[in-house]
């Protein structure tokens, strides 16, 4: 019972987010299409974490490479968990409003974005948005229904890239090592006639230090408002790439429509099954529900996904990979809209037991589908 209480408490204060969709010039490219996403929405807090480039425990990916014309308006969509909201009227979708901070976009040139590794890459920044007239980039993303928009520089040279989108939540950043980094990578191909191959290159990990003034910072003024005390906010990392003529640091949102359904390009002859790791169910879903391979696993009431694992194994993997470090950082909401106090709960004794407990529950029982 104690283990159940600990896991329930951790889940109840999870106000995190996952980048999981891309739009190009207003066209939604599809859920998890070309995006390498983890099951877990937990952040990385160690700037020297070996998986700081594209996140850890990546389980959801396909071979899609998204074509992005140089100069295009690009959108990155964030959701509280895979599929979006954790339930109806989820107050923390796409992320808790208290998680103020900047959003940045980096590119790394690769030979084949579909299967490129993330170690040893050289990254250059193409867009950033921080604090502007009291409004944070995260505020704009929430107002846009989870979409963060930026303009891909028109001078970027064509080719395959990994596109790293990073959200930095600063609500607890007054403590060293407590700033929360959320990042995922998309697989893209830049098209056009640009010739700029990047500048101000950095490595991940290695680009940031824990005591950078944009990472170790109290963003609250004396009245508890997240204004950074009226001071300019310094975004970590290098300056973004600029082309002649400049760029728009705060692009306005544009309507996003769904991409046309691609035609089948082969398969097992039936052609009706959803692809591995594709959506196969959920409230309001109208696509295929049969499985070409794998098992349709309910992530929540609104989203089911094809997994090569059994229901039990899939949920065990989700649970165990959600926080590889046994002590779990739990933020307690003590004030209106802000999280001022953090607790560390040691779940080492109960981690495996509770994962088994939750994994054997059917998905229609509360707690059975994490």
Curated annotation (Swiss-Prot):
Cofactors per UniProt? Cu(2+)
Fetch the SUPFAM superfamilies from UniProt: Cellulose-binding domain
Give me the segments passing through the membrane.
none
Where in the sequence does glycosylation occur per the annotation?
329
Q: Which PROSITE patterns match?
A: CBM1_2
Q: Which organism is it from?
A: Podospora anserina (strain S / ATCC MYA-4624 / DSM 980 / FGSC 10383) (Pleurage anserina)
Disulfide-bonded cysteine pairs: these are 155-243
Range of residues in the leader sequence: 1-15
Please identify the protein, giving its name as recorded: AA9 family lytic polysaccharide monooxygenase H
Q: What is the reaction catalyzed?
A: [(1->4)-beta-D-glucosyl]n+m + reduced acceptor + O2 = 4-dehydro-beta-D-glucosyl-[(1->4)-beta-D-glucosyl]n-1 + [(1->4)-beta-D-glucosyl]m + acceptor + H2O
Name the positions where O2 binds: 171, 180
- Cofactor note text: Binds 1 copper ion per subunit.
- One GO CC term of this entry? extracellular region
What are the boundaries of the region Disordered? Answer: 228-272
This protein's major location comes to: secreted
CBM1 domain ranges (all copies)? 272-307
Annotated residues that bind Cu(2+) are located at: 16, 99, 182
The Swiss-Prot or TrEMBL record describes its family as follows:
Belongs to the polysaccharide monooxygenase AA9 family.
Coiled coil, from the record: none
Keywords tagged on the record? Carbohydrate metabolism, Cellulose degradation, Copper, Disulfide bond, Glycoprotein, Metal-binding, Monooxygenase, Oxidoreductase, Polysaccharide degradation, Secreted, Signal
Q: Which EC number applies?
A: 1.14.99.56
- Could you tell me the Gene Ontology terms of the biological process aspect for this record? cellulose catabolic process
- Cell compartment(s), UniProt: Secreted
Q: How is its activity regulated?
A: Glucose dehydrogenase and aryl-alcohol quinone oxidoreductases regulate the oxidative degradation of cellulose since they can act as catalytically efficient electron donors for LPMO9E.
Q: How is it used?
A: Lignocellulose is the most abundant polymeric composite on Earth and is a recalcitrant but promising renewable substrate for industrial biotechnology applications. Together with cellobiose dehydrogenases (CDHs) an enzymatic system capable of oxidative cellulose cleavage is formed, which increases the efficiency of cellulases and put LPMOs at focus of biofuel research. Glucose dehydrogenase and aryl-alcohol quinone oxidoreductases are also catalytically efficient electron donors for LPMO9E and can replace CDHs.
UniProt GO molecular function: cellulose binding; metal ion binding; monooxygenase activity
